[in-house]
Amino acid sequence: MPGNSLGKMFRITTFGESHGPMIGVIVDGVPAGLYISKEDIEFELSFRRPGKQFVSGRREKDEPEIVSGVYNGRTTGAPLTIIIRNNDVISSLYEEVKHKPRPGHADLPYIMKYGYENWDYRGGGRSSARETASRVAASAIAKKLLMLTDTVIGAHLKSLGPVELDEDVSFREIFCSKYSPVRASKKWLEEKYEELIKQATVEGDSWGGVAEVIADNVPIGLGEPVFDKLKSDLAKALLSIPAVVGFEYGLGFKASKMKGSEANDEIVIKDNGKLGWRYNKAGGILGGLSNGEKLVLRCAFKPTSSIRKPQKTVDLRTSEESTIRVIGRHDPAVAIRGVSVAEAMVALVLVDHALRSGYIPPVKLSEDQARIIEEKWRRYVEECKPMQESQ
C-alpha cells in the first residue's frame, strides 16, 4: 500500500491501524541540533485527543514515544520515529461492520481494492481518522522549526452545520480557539456549536463543518512552479485528511462569481514601507508562491459517517440489501478535531517548503538557532493561555 508519505525535504511516513497495537510516524529531514521532547509532542496532541466532551468517547492517552533520531534531547539528523500506542480498543463493536460496509465510509472501496479477506474492518483500519494523530505528532517538530522564520499557525472551526461565523475575528482569537472544546473563536459561537452537537447526539446523527487555518509571517516565495506550487501541496495535504471534501484559499470559490475588477487586489506600499496587497484577497498565495501576506485557507469536512440512525447497506454474506446502525464511539462532528489536523498539515507543508527555499538550514542548526527556537517555542506554549481564561 504505497501513498503513506508526504513531503520532499521534510518527509513524513505514517504507519499503523486504528485497532492495531500502535500508530506512528517516521520524520525524515529534520536538521540536527533541534531540542525536542515528549512534552513538545504531547502539547500538540492534546488538542486532537479523543475522550473529551463533544468528541469521540474513545479514551486514548496519546502518549508519544520517541524511539529514534534523538540523543540527549536533541535531534541527530537521522530519521526520527514516534510511536503512539493504542490502549482503548473495543473491536467487538465492529463485528457487524465486518459483513456490512458502512455508508459514507471507505469500507467498500477498501474491500474492492485490497480484497475482503485482507480488509482490517476494526475501527476502519488504516482509513480511520486515528491515523491523523501521527500527523499531529510530526507537526510539533514542524512548528518548532518554523519558529526560525517566526511563522505562527492558528486554526478554528469557522462553521458547523448551518451556523457560520459572519464577523471579523482576530488572529489572536483564532490562535486561542485551541482551548475551546469545539474550536470556536467566539464565545457565542461556542454556545451555538455545542447546542448543535448535543442535538445531533440525541438524534444519533452528525454535522459537517469548515476549518479555517491562518498562518502569519510566512516567508516570501515558498512554492516551486509549476507542479509543486504552495497551493498544490497544501491542497494535497488537506484533502488527504479523512472526511475533508473541499479546499479553498483566499476568496476561494467566491472568486468564480466576481469580475476581475472585484477579485483583483490592489498593490500598495504598506506602513512599513514594503510592497504588499491592500486586502489580501489572494489569501497569501499568488502564482503558487507565498507573497508575504497572511496565509488564509479553508477545508470542508463532511458529517461523520458513523451514525446511529439506520442506513441501507448490503450484507456481504448473503449479497442482500440490509440495514446498519453504527454503535461504536464516534465524533458527532469530526470537523472539531479535524481543525487540529488541518493546522498540522499546513505546518508540515510550510516547513518542507521553508527547507527547500533555504529559510531553514537542512543539515544542522547552529547553537544560536537551536536556542532561539526553544525560547520562542516556550512562549508559544504559554502565551495564549491567560487570554483564553479571560474570555
From Swiss-Prot:
Keyword Flavoprotein: yes
One GO CC term on file: cytosol
Binding site for NADP(+): 48
Catalytic reaction annotation: 5-O-(1-carboxyvinyl)-3-phosphoshikimate = chorismate + phosphate
Pathway: Metabolic intermediate biosynthesis; chorismate biosynthesis; chorismate from D-erythrose 4-phosphate and phosphoenolpyruvate: step 7/7
Binding site for FMN: 126-128, 287, 302-306, 329
PROSITE patterns: CHORISMATE_SYNTHASE_1, CHORISMATE_SYNTHASE_3
Single Gene Ontology BP annotation: chorismate biosynthetic process
Domain of life: Archaea
Molecular function terms, GO-annotated: chorismate synthase activity; FMN binding
EC number(s) stated in the UniProt entry for this protein: 4.2.3.5
Note on how the cofactor is bound: Reduced FMN (FMNH(2)).
Names of required cofactors: FMNH2
Pfam families listed in its UniProt record: Chorismate_synt (PF01264)
Lyase among keywords: yes
Function recorded in the entry: This reaction introduces a second double bond into the aromatic ring system.
Alphabetized HAMAP family for the sequence: Chorismate_synth
Annotated family: Belongs to the chorismate synthase family.
Protein name: Chorismate synthase
